[in-house]
A protein has these predicted regions:
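Short, surface-exposed "cap/lid" segments of acyl-processing enzymes
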Residues: 39-126
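Small-residue-enriched hydrophobic alpha-helices in membranes
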Residues: 564-729
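Alpha/beta-hydrolase-fold enzymes
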Residues: 1-26, 148, 152, 169-278, ...
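Alpha/beta-hydrolase-fold serine-hydrolase catalytic core, especially in secreted/extracellular enzymes
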Residues: 1-4, 123, 288, 292-306, ...
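Alpha/beta-hydrolase active-site loop
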Residues: 130-148
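Short beta-strand/loop motif that positions the catalytic acidic residue
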Residues: 311, 317-319, 323
Length: 729
C-alpha cells in the first residue's frame, strides 16, 4: 500500500536528519579536541601514566625527544628480572603515543608479560638545527639509561621501532650494537626501491615529482621547518576511498556507538608535528630516493659507515601484504642487499626473524588490538627464545592452540609460536625488482640530485628571502588538513547551535528498523562510491607506474645521468669487507680449538642442537622446557645460555664430525649424570609432541655418544617447575 511505502521513507528521513546532526556534533568535538590537544606542552595519546626519565633538550646535542618510564596499571605486576622493553614511536607527521594507544597495544602486551616498559616520544617542534644523527645519539643515551636502571634484568633492552622509528633504530644499532637486546621493527621500510609491478606505487612518487627538490622547497616555505601535515596527507592519498568516504561514512552509519573510537583515533591522526628541513631532506635523499641504508652508503659526521651487518642483536621484522606503505619487499629486501645466502648471515652472527601478515594495513601493524594480542603478544612472551636462536634466517609462524596441541602448558596465551628456518630464496619468492628496475630507480636518484642542485642554485635564495617565520606559520595554519579540524570547532560561530541540537536529538533518538529497505539501499550506494574511488585509485596507480617505467627506463636518460643502461649488477649492493673475512677466519680457528671443551653443559647443548637439526624449526614449547630445566639446575643467566647455544651451533656448523666425536670426552664418568643429561635433551625435543623417525635416529646417536645404548631413562615434564607468570587484571 502507499502507506506501507511511506512509513519506511519517513522513518529513514527522520533517522538521516538525526544522524546528520550527531555526525556534525562529532566533527565539532573533533575540532575542539584538536585545539585542546595541540595546546598541551607534550601532546600525546598514551593510554598510560608515565614519568620522565630523560629530556632530550638537556643533552649536549639537544633534540626534541623524551624518554619516559610507563607506569603499569592496577593489577599488572612487573618482574624486575625480565628485560625491559623500549617502544619508539614514529615521527612521520603524527604525534607520539600510538604504541601505547590502548590496553591491547605493544606497551600493554609487554607489561602484561611482566616486562618493564619505556616509551620514546617527541615534542611537536624540533630543536633548531637538530639532525637525524643527533636523535640517534640521544636514543643511545636513552637505552643506556634504561639498561643502568635494570641491573637485575635477564638481558639487554628489547627495542621496538614502529614505521619511521624502525629504520632509525636499525641505524643506531649498526652504530652501537652493544646497546641492544632483540630489535623489533614493525612496518618499517629498509629497502626503499623494492616492490613488485602492479602494487605499492608509493615508491614511484619521488621519481614522478622530479626528486627531492620539492622537499627542499617545502622546508624553505616553512622557514627551516617541514610541516608534518604533508606526510599525513601523503598517507591519506594512498587510500582515497577511505579518506574521502569510508572513514566518514563508517562514523555516520554507526553514529550511536562509533564516536569514542573515532575521536580517539583522530586525536592521534590530527596531532601533526614538524621536522627540521635538514631532517626531512636526509630522510628523502638518503633513504626513500637514494636507498643508501642497506647499501652501506650512509656516513655519520665523523666518517663512520652505517653497516647493518654490524648489528649483533636478533632482528624481528613484522610486515604485511596488506601494507601499501611498507610492503614486505621494502621490509625484507635489505637482507638480499647485504647477503648472498644464509651462510653469510651466520658468518656475521646475525639472527633475522620475519613474519608476514596476510591482510592488515600499515597502521594496523602497530594499532590493531588483534595484532597486539597475537603477534606482539607472542613476541613479548617469547623474546628470550628469539634472543637465543642460533644465527640464521627464520620465519615466525603462529598456530592456534587447540585441544590437540601437545603440551599446551608450555605455550602461554592462545597461540604457539615456532621459528622455521628459511633461505634467501623464500624472500626472493615474494617478488622484487629486476636489474632493469634497479637502473630505473638509480636514474631517478640521479635526476633528483640534479634537480635539487638546480633548485638550490637558482630558486632557494629567492624563496628564503620571501618567507619569514610569520609567513611560514600562517602557511602551516591554512594547510587543508589543519583547516578541516579548525573549521568545525567551536571557533566557528556556525557550529554554536550544533551541540544543543545534538543533545535534543539524543533525547529523542529514533533508529530505523533493521529491515528498512532504504537503509539497505544506502549501504549499496556506499559500496558503489567506494568501488568508484578504488577504481580511480587503481587507474591512477597504473598510470603512475607506466609513466615511471617509461621515463626512467629510457636508455638515453640513463646514459645522460651516468647510469649504465647495460649494467648487469645490482646498483645498491653492499660491498664486502675484507677485514670481516679475516676476523671470521680467526673466530673459526678459535672455535675449532674449543671443540673438546665445555664439559657436561656444553655436551648437552651440542647434543640437543644436533638432535633437532633436521627439524628446521624452533618451537616455543621446547624453549620453555629448556628454560624450566635451566632454572631447576642453577638458573644459568640467559646471556650465558645464549652465548653457549651460539657457540655450540657454530662448532657443529664448522666441523660436525669432530664436534660429535668430542662429546664422550666432555662427559663425566658416572652413568647417572649422563642419563640425566640425555633425558634433558629428550624432554626439550619432545616438548612439541611425538618424535619423528629422524628425531629418534638422531637421539639414538646421542645416546651412543652419552654411553647409553638403551636410550636413558624417562623424566616426566611435570617434574620441572613452571614459569612464573606476571599477574594481570
Amino acid at each position: 500500500t502507499p502507506f506501507g511505502l511511506f512509513a519506511p521513507a519517513m522513518e529513514y528521513m527522520v533517522d538521516a536528519a538525526q544522524r546528520s546532526v550527531l555526525f556534525w556534533d562529532v566533527m565539532r568535538q573533533r575540532g575542539n579536541q584538536y585545539r585542546e590537544h595541540l595546546a598541551k606542552t607534550v601532546p600525546h595519546v598514551l593510554d598510560y601514566k608515565a614519568e620522565l626519565v630523560v629530556d632530550g633538550r638537556t643533552l649536549e646535542r639537544p633534540v626534541n625527544y623524551l624518554l619516559v618510564r610507563v607506569t603499569p596499571p592496577a593489577g599488572v605486576e612487573i618482574n624486575p628480572k625480565l628485560r625491559p622493553f623500549v617502544i619508539v614511536d614514529p615521527r612521520a607527521g603524527h604525534g607520539p603515543g600510538i604504541g601505547g594507544f590502548k590496553a591491547d597495544s605493544e606497551i600493554g602486551v609487554a607489561m602484561k608479560a611482566g616486562h618493564p616498559c619505556y616509551f620514546v616520544g617527541f615534542l611537536p617542534d624540533p630543536v633548531p638545527e637538530q639532525t637525524i644523527e643527533d636523535i640517534a645519539r640521544a636514543e643511545a643515551i636513552f637505552i643506556e639509561k634504561v639498561t643502568a636502571a635494570h641491573p637485575q634484568a635477564s638481558g639487554k633492552p628489547c627495542v621496538i621501532g614502529n614505521c619511521q622509528a624502525g629504520w632509525a633504530i636499525m641505524m643506531l644499532a649498526a652504530l652501537r650494537p652493544e646497546l641492544f637486546g632483540p630489535i623489533i621493527v614493525a612496518g618499517s621500510p629498509l629497502s626503499y626501491w623494492a616492490g613488485v609491478h602492479g602494487k605499492y606505487p608509493m615508491r614511484y612518487s619521488g621519481g614522478l615529482l622530479g626528486g627531492s627538490w620539492l622537499t627542499a622547497l617545502a622546508g624553505d616555505l616553512g622557514h627551516g621547518k617541514f610541516d608534518g601535515a604533508w606526510l599525513v596527507q601523503n598517507f591519506e592519498n594512498q587510500n582515497p576511498a577511505n579518506t574521502l568516504w569510508t572513514k566518514q561514512y563508517n562514523l555516520y552509519s554507526k553514529i550511536d556507538t562509533e564516536a569514542p573510537r573515532y575521536l580517539g583515533f583522530e586525536k592521534w591522526w590530527g596531532g601533526h608535528v614538524n621536522l627540521n628541513a635538514e631532517e626531512i631532506q636526509f630522510i628523502v635523499d638518503e633513504l626513500f630516493i637514494g636507498n643508501n641504508l642497506a647499501a652501506g652508503r650512509i656516513h655519520t659526521s665523523d666518517g663512520t659507515t652505517l653497516d647493518l651487518r654490524n648489528i649483533r642483536s636478533p632482528i624481528v621484522v613484522f610486515c604485511s601484504k596488506g601494507d601499501n606503505v611498507t610492503p614486505p619487499q621494502q621490509a625484507l629486501d635489505w637482507v638480499l642487499d647485504l647477503y648472498e645466502n644464509v651462510d653469510d648471515i651466520r658468518a656475521c652472527g646475525q639472527t633475522i626473524v620475519y613474519t608476514i601478515h596476510e591482510s592488515i594495513g600499515h597502521l594496523g601493524i602497530f594499532v590493531s588490538g588483534g595484532v597486539a594480542k597475537k603477534e606482539h603478544g607472542e613476541f613479548s612472551s617469547n623474546i628470550d627464545l628469539i634472543d637465543t636462536l642460533p644465527p640464521g634466517l627464520y620465519e615466525a609462524i603462529f598456530e592456534n592452540k587447540t585441544g590437540d596441541t601437545a603440551n599446551p602448558d608450555l605455550a602461554g596465551g592462545n597461540w604457539v609460536m615456532r621459528c622455521e628456518a628459511r633461505t634467501l630464496d623464500d624472500i626472493r619468492a615474494l617478488g622484487g625488482n629486476d636489474l632493469a628496475d634497479e637502473r630505473r630507480f638509480a636514474t631517478a636518484a640521479r635526476v633528483s640530485e640534479i634537480n635539487l642542485s638546480l633548485y638550490r642554485t637558482f630558486m632557494q635564495p629567492m624563496v628564503r628571502a620571501l618567507v619569514n617565520a610569520p609567513v611560514a606559520d600562517w602557511m602551516r595554519q591554512i594547510h587543508p588538513l589543519r583547516l578541516q579540524y579548525e573549521v568545525f570547532s567551536d571557533q566557528n560561530p556556525a557550529m554554536a547551535s550544533v551541540a544543543a541540537l545534538a543533545e535534543q536529538v539524543r533525547e529523542n533518538r529514533k533508529s530505523p528498523a533493521s529491515d528498512n529497505p532504504l537503509v539497505a539501499m544506502q549501504e549499496k550506494f556506499s559500496d558503489q562510491i567506494v568501488a568508484a574511488l578504488d577504481g580511480w585509485r587503481q587507474a591512477s596507480e597504473t598510470l603512475s607506474e607506466r609513466m615511471f617505467l617509461a621515463i626512467y627506463g629510457s636508455p638515453t636518460l640513463q646514459a645522460a645521468v651516468g647510469v649504465d643502461p647495460d649494467a648487469t649488477q645490482r646498483l645498491r649492493k653492499a660491498p664486502k669487507n675484507p677485514l670481516h673475512r679475516e676476523l671470521l677466519q680467526k673466530r673459526i680457528a678459535e672455535l675449532k680449538s674449543r671443540i673438546p671443551t665445555g664439559g657436561l653443559r656444553a655436551a648437552i647443548i651440542r647434543g640437543l642442537i644436533y638432535a633437532g637439526m633436521n627439524r628446521a624449526a624452533v618451537d616455543e614449547r621446547g624453549f620453555e622446557m629448556a628454560r624450566r630445566i635451566r632454572e631447576a639446575h642453577g638458573d644459568m643467566p640467559i646471556a650465558d645460555f645464549k652465548a653457549l647455544v651460539r657457540e655450540q651451533f657454530y662448532i657443529l656448523l664448522i666441523d660436525q664430525e669432530a664436534a660429535l666425536a668430542a662429546i664422550p670426552s666432555m662427559l663425566p664418568p658416572d652413568k647417572e649424570t649422563r642419563e640425566k643429561g640425555y633425558d634433558l635433551i629428550k624432554q626439550v625435543l619432545g616438548a612439541r609432541g611425538e618424535l619423528s623417525a629422524d628425531d629418534n635416529k638422531r637421539m639414538s646417536e646421542v645416546a651412543r655418544l652419552f654411553g647409553l645404548e638403551g636410550g636413558g631413562t624417562r623424566t616426566h615434564l611435570r617434574e620441572v617447575p613452571k614459569k612464573p607468570q606476571a599477574k594481570a587484571s
